[in-house]
Curated annotation (Swiss-Prot):
It is an enzyme of class 6 (ligase). Its EC number is 6.3.3.1. It is found in: Cytoplasm. It comes from the Bacteria. Keywords: ATP-binding, Cytoplasm, Ligase, Nucleotide-binding, Purine biosynthesis. Its main location: cytoplasm. Belongs to the AIR synthase family. One of its GO terms (molecular function) is phosphoribosylamine-glycine ligase activity. This is Phosphoribosylformylglycinamidine cyclo-ligase. One of its GO terms (cellular component) is cytosol. GO terms for biological process: 'de novo' IMP biosynthetic process; adenine biosynthetic process.
């Protein structure tokens, strides 16, 4: 009988001790996001959360998303502390479109080799995003999968659940001719269009550390996605909101029609705002057409709100008081059968 080497999980590339060390590092992050409805702490097989008091007919709203290939750029630049904010933003901003208050959030972190410092930086960002949006980070999964990811590359996904009163669901059905449209400024490209961003960087051979306005190209591209939860929830309480559109993948052409009834058209006034410098740089460096820019990027507009025209000034005042850069970007008109639902002029 020959002696055989005793193999362990660590020999196979999975370090359970590193995973446990990460859990200890992030417990405080979760605690800072806690809501009174959450029962128990991290470490259970499932997270328990009550419906907040005061709802008569609560409807749960769920969403999941990732950060896309913005993550590749962040990994290459070793900038791990803000992609977690992006992750939360992409989920919670989708929830508030239907008028839902985010309740709790879970994350999934997958990597070929777990680097505790990197993972802790990412999760700390997730915690910051949860604090900004008022939702609780109740759990997650860290998967170390050797052979599935190159080196210390990683991917992240987020899952969020919110709640809305059934009678107060915002579904776009009330949008009608004469409604005003408000834009909420984006902080940058947010988390969409980064495969095109990376292609432009490759073809142009641009130095990402080059100055761009009062920052650098790298910082402008990696600026975390703006979270609109708190100001928008306040707006919903104070004003009659007919629809909200989160300008993500598909840009203006695809996201605005998602909340418009048939035979209505959004007319966007292109003169009402100036593209932030990063979008002008991308268009020029990549020789990207205007149509493709509006199809791929938010071009400085993170969310569009439809509401009765007589609510416009009240809403703008409230949003600006809440710290948002908001402006009147257009209006709703009738559209004939087969006519485009978005016009940018």
């Amino acid at each position: 009988m020959t002696d055989k080497t005793s193999l362990s999980y660590k020999d196979a590339g999975v370090d359970i001790d590193a995973g446990n060390a990460l859990v200890e590092r992030i417990k405080g992050v979760s605690k800072r996001t806690r809501r009174p409805e959450v029962l128990g702490g991290l470490g259970g097989f499932g997270a328990l959360c009550q419906i907040p008091a005061g709802y008569k007919e609560p409807v749960l709203v769920s969403g999941t998303d990732g950060v896309g290939t913005k993550l590749r750029l962040a990994i290459d630049l070793k900038k791990h502390d803000t992609v977690g904010i992006d992750l939360v933003a992409m989920c919670v901003n989708d929830l508030i479109v239907q008028g839902a208050e985010p309740l709790f959030f879970l994350d999934y972190y997958a990597t070929g080799k777990l680097d505790v410092d990197t993972a802790a930086a990412v999760v700390t960002g997730i915690g910051a995003g949860c604090e900004q949006s008022g939702c609780a980070l109740v759990g997650g999964e860290t998967a170390e999968m050797p052979g599935m990811y190159e080196g210390e590359d990683y991917d992240i996904a987020g899952f969020c659940v919110g709640v809305v009163e059934k009678s107060e669901i915002i579904d776009g059905s009330k949008v009608g001719e004469g409604d005003a449209l408000i834009a909420l400024a984006a902080s940058g490209p947010h988390s969409n269009g980064f495969s095109l961003v990376r292609k432009i960087l490759e073809v142009s051979k641009a130095d990402v550390q080059q100055p761009l306005g009062d920052t650098t190209l790298a910082n402008a591209l990696l600026e975390p996605t703006r979270i609109y939860v708190k100001p928008v929830l306040k707006l919903i309480k104070e004003c009659e909101i007919h629809a909200l559109s989160h300008i993500t993948g598909g840009g203006f052409w695809e996201n605005i029609p998602r909340v418009l009834p048939a035979n209505t058209q959004a007319v966007i006034d292109e003169q009402s705002w100036q593209w932030p410098a990063v979008f002008s740089w991308l268009q020029q460096a990549g020789n990207v057409t205007r149509h493709e820019m509006y199809r791929t990027f938010n071009c400085g507009v993170g969310m569009i709100i439809a509401l009765p025209a007589d609510q416009l000034e009240k809403a703008l005042t409230l949003l600006k008081t809440e710290g948002e850069n908001a402006w009147h970007i257009g209006y709703i008109t009738k559209a004939a059968d087969g006519e485009e639902q978005v016009i940018i002029q």
